[in-house]
Each structure stands twice: as structure tokens, then as C-alpha cells.
Amino acid sequence: MGAPLSTARRGMGQNLSVPNPLGFFPDHQLDPLFRANSSSPDWDFNTNKDNWPMANKVGVGGFGPGFTPPHGGLLGWSPQAQGILTTSPPDPPPASTNRRSGRKPTPVSPPLRDTHPQAMQWNSTQFHQALLDPRVRGLYFPAGGSSSETQNPVPTIASLTSSIFSKTGDPAMNMENITSGLLGPLLVLQAVCFLLTKILTIPQSLDSWWTSLNFLGVPPGCPGQNSQSPISNHLPTSCPPTCPGYRWMCLRRFIIFLFILLLCLIFLLVLLDYQGMLPVCPLLPGSTTTSTGPCKTCTTLAQGTSMFPSCCCTKPSDGNCTCIPIPSSWAFGKYLWEWASARFSWLSLLVQFVQWCVGLSPTVWLLVIWMIWYWGPNLCSILSPFIPLLPIFCYLWASI
């Protein structure tokens, strides 16, 4: 392990605290490999370098015997690399930067044209020409930067900018776009919640109107509160589960929900029939049945679209058939009217009555105004629960 040293050695022998098994690879140019001799002087400017033979001296080290590098080497030229441990505190900052005397503000950065003039010499044309070089193009387009193929310049600056951002990172998001993108769904959600709360009040309002018919001129009250189990006074529309009238209240609410669902289905059916999405064949003259099919050989050609079903044909006679085109709108309504008129002959009189009312339009309008004036408040109280459904119906009517 080597005898302890009584005196400090100079040079590499002094470095006894830094073990380095690779000390026999010195990092200066005195190696004969660099042909350093008297004719070729040393160009290593390290003032603390040792003579070459002293690099072979053995140092104790922290992990046993080993070769200690000459000056610096893999450890650098610092005092710690030389084996000199310095424990003195660092020098205080000069007075100009001392906090006691006040620090000067950071100077304003000079403009880009002064610090990086080479960056101001580029324009889009020069940049496109530089992209023709495969080595430069490979920095922005790794998939197309090979030197074996010729690449065309980027046609637009926008596409070039997007490619550079995809390489260096996404740009900062525009908060205005984020706000406008979130504002729309929030308003829709608020409108949906408002309509939902209003729609949920429809059954309760209709239930109140239904029960009020049983208490004409008398304040409504639940008959179940006079049973054997006394319950506090309450309305028949807010019976607790322990009240005998609770089951009747649930039954009324269920019937009201079915009525609302039927009303929505009727509205949807009318809307589809108006748009011509119900290609129902009308009743053929002189018959109570219909036969829908393509027109092949018809005595009367069908006018309009040729898509199937395009016409209504009677039973063929002698290979020919009578064809009637399907109406493009209100086909189902016309079918229902023809079907009802064939079974109830008195309905045909309503057509003349409607035509007569249309001919007397001022009288009809005055009659309608008088009816609204007389029965308007009662109609409003009855139809007010259905007002929240009006925007939904209007939206469906406009969208389909």
C-alpha cells in the first residue's frame, strides 16, 4: 500500500486524495506520440504541469494504490483536480453589485438586428431555396429530408409555419377562441336545464288543472286526509306516500305523461308528413285498397319523381294499370281524409263549410278575435304548461 509520507511531495505526488486508475493516460502534449521535444516545444500552457517521469509515481488515493494523473487530465485543471483542497470562502462581490449599495437594473436587450444580424437576412424566398438542400430540409421534414430525392419548396408560408411548430412545439393557444368555444355549449346547457325544469312542471300544472275540475267553487283538498290515519291538510297534487290519495296522484301523472308523449309523436308525424317523408299512397278511385309499386305500363303516367314508390297502381287489366302519383307533401293527411270521407259521408260537408269560411274571411277573423277575448284567460291558464314545448317544436320544425 506504500509507506506514509512525512513531507508533502510536489507535483503529482502531492495529489493523495483523488484516486484515478487511468492516471497513466495524461492529458498534455508531452507524450512522445505528439512529438514534443526540444525541436518541437511544448504547447501545453498549463503552468501546474509536471514532468513526464513524475506521472508514474504511485499515490495512495482514497481507494487504494493507483496511478495519479498529472495535471488535470480527466478531472480538469481545478485545484480540486490537482489534489489541493481549498476551504476558503469565495470572494465577496464587488461594490458595484453589492446589495448594500444597490443593484443596477438590468439593461434593455438590444434589438435583434444588432445581436443577430444573420437572422434578419433571411426572407421567404431564401428560406424556400435553402429547403432544397436535403440536409436543411431534414431539420424540418424528417420524413422527406433524404439526399437521394429532390424536394420541392414549400408553397406557402402558412404550411411552413405549421411544420416548424410541429417540430419545435405548439404555439400558445388563443384564449379568445377557447372562450368562444366554451360559451356556446354552456349557453346550450343552461337553456336545456331551464327547459327541463319547466317541462317537469307540466305534469304538476296539468294535475292541478285536472283536480280543480272536481272542486268547482270549492278549495281543493285531498280526500285521503279524512281517513283513519289522520294526515295534515295538503293539496291533492302533493300527497305524501302515506296518503291514500298518493296512488291516484301517480296514476294521473302517468296519464299526463302518456298524453304529452302522444302529443310529441303527433307533432313529429305531422312534421314528417309536411316534409314528404311519408310516401303513403292515396286511395284509388272506386276502391278501398291501395297498391304501391313501380310504374311499368300505365294508362295514366305518374308525374313527379321516379323513385320507388313513385305511383299507386290499380290491378292490371290486359297488362295495363292506372297509376296515381304520390303527393310530395301531406300524403298521409290526404290518405286519412280520403279514408274518413269514404266511411263518413257527412265529412264532405265540412269542405264546403271551410270554403265558405275562407270566403268570409273578415267575419271569421272577427269571430276568432271575439273567442280569444272571451275565453283567452282560461285558454292561457290551460295552455301555459305547454309553452316550454313551443321552442322545441319550432326547432324541430326548422331543422327537418
UniProtKB/Swiss-Prot annotation:
It is found in: Virion membrane. Residues 70-115 are annotated as: Disordered. InterPro entries: HBV_HBSAG. One of its GO terms (cellular component) is virion membrane. Residues 2-119 are annotated as: Pre-S1. Keywords: Acetylation, Caveolin-mediated endocytosis of virus by host, Fusion of virus membrane with host endosomal membrane, Fusion of virus membrane with host membrane, Glycoprotein, Host-virus interaction, Lipoprotein, Membrane, Myristate, Transmembrane, Transmembrane helix, Viral attachment to host cell, Viral envelope protein, Viral penetration into host cytoplasm, Virion, Virus endocytosis by host, Virus entry into host cell. The chain crosses the membrane at residues 182-202, 254-274, 349-369, 376-398. Belongs to the orthohepadnavirus major surface antigen family. The large envelope protein exists in two topological conformations, one which is termed 'external' or Le-HBsAg and the other 'internal' or Li-HBsAg. In its external conformation the protein attaches the virus to cell receptors and thereby initiating infection. This interaction determines the species specificity and liver tropism. This attachment induces virion internalization predominantly through caveolin-mediated endocytosis. The large envelope protein also assures fusion between virion membrane and endosomal membrane. This is Large envelope protein. It comes from Hepatitis B virus genotype H subtype adw4 (isolate Nicaragua/1853Nic/1997) (HBV-H). The gene is S.
